[in-house]
A protein has these predicted regions:
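Regulatory input/activation interfaces that engage signals or partners
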Residues: 4-12, 16-32, 36-142, 147-153, ...
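A cross-family signal for key residues in well-ordered alpha-helices
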Residues: 166, 220, 233, 251, ...
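Short alpha-helical interdomain "coupling" segment at the junction between an upstream regulatory sensor module
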Residues: 176-193
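Short helix-to-turn junction characteristic of helix-turn-helix DNA-binding domains
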Residues: 222-226, 265
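Recognition helix of helix-turn-helix DNA-binding domains
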Residues: 225-260
């Protein structure tokens, strides 16, 4: 016997982890399966909250499970799914075609993400500091995303946590594939695409009546948490040019901060025309004040 393998076989096993893995395998195909996955992840690193979502390219994500921390519950249930998900780094990574794997927020977030309004609203304001996502790609247009989170009361995830999660990832991904094969028919019955079509229309048409196409590209990078330097790199131009575009955006939209821009973008989503080319900002601004207050 290879002495290296002998040593590995003699390593002590964590009985709690083994029990959690056994429960996860036994629960494949059941409604409680995602709970058992979170229990497994909670055995290898500290987890304050977490959940699972089904990502779609052509419709809004579907929440399967979310174990909230108390502060997260202070947000309306649909606060994320009503549109802001389009700015989520993991959702954007999914749209870009990333492979199945483990993704740490600090590795994939844009360089100014932690100063963005999105991070303030959906992380720090509700007490979160960090997250790790385990994404399994079903096909080009769909993926299952399992996520775990840390609160601001505790230290962010560390490299040792990621090593442990990545060690277990092949087992979890294999179990995910089996679970999906048994439950796919039920998942496909969810077909509400209206919100996602409105979100996509807002991304494509927001402020088109006031801004140039390049300014609108810069705007989306702004609210996604990209710095001027990284935006310039993505758009293959200079940082100085991007800064000029940013000034023009603030002037044309009569806003003074990223918080105002983020808020305006979100408020315009209900006024977007699905699959259309109408500027939702123009519709929003022309709507009666009472109608705007309801969004």
């Amino acid at each position: 016997m290879d002495p290296t393998n002998a040593t590995r076989l003699c390593l002590p096993l964590d009985t709690d982890l083994v029990a959690a893995l056994a429960t996860m395998v036994e629960a494949i195909g059941s409604p409680d399966w995602f709970d058992t996955v979170l229990n497994v992840l909670g055995k290898v690193c500290a987890v304050d909250s977490g959940g699972a979502m089904l990502f779609h390219r052509h419709q809004q994500p579907r929440r399967i499970l979310h174990r909230f921390n108390p502060q997260e519950r202070s947000l309306p249930e649909d606060a994320f799914l009503s549109g802001p998900y389009v700015l989520d780094p993991n959702y954007q990574l999914f749209l870009q075609g990333c492979p199945s794997g483990v993704y740490w927020l600090r590795d994939i977030a844009p360089d100014d993400f932690y100063d963005s309004e999105y991070y303030r609203v959906f992380y720090s304001q509700i007490g979160l500091s960090d997250s790790v996502d385990l994404l399994w790609r079903i096909n080009e247009d769909t993926a299952l995303n399992i996520f775990i989170e840390r609160s601001i009361r505790h230290t962010p995830f560390q490299a040792t946590d990621l090593l442990a999660i990545r060690t277990l990832a092949p087992i979890i991904i294999a179990a995910t594939a089996k679970h999906h094969a048994l439950t796919a028919a039920a998942a496909e019955r969810h077909s509400d695409r209206l919100t996602h079509r409105k979100v996509q229309s807002t991304v494509e048409n927001f402020a088109r009546s006031l801004l140039t196409q390049r300014e609108r590209q810069v705007l989306f990078y702004m609210i996604s948490g990209y710095s001027s330097a990284l935006t310039a790199q993505r758009l293959k131009t200079t940082e100085g040019t991007i800064k000029i575009h940013r000034k023009n955006i603030h002037r044309k939209l009569d806003i003074g901060s990223q918080a105002e821009l983020f808020s305006l973008f979100i408020q315009c989503i209900p006024f977007a025309e699905p699959d259309g080319a109408v500027d939702p900002l123009a519709v929003y601004q022309s709507a009666p004040a009472a109608s705007r207050c309801k969004t």
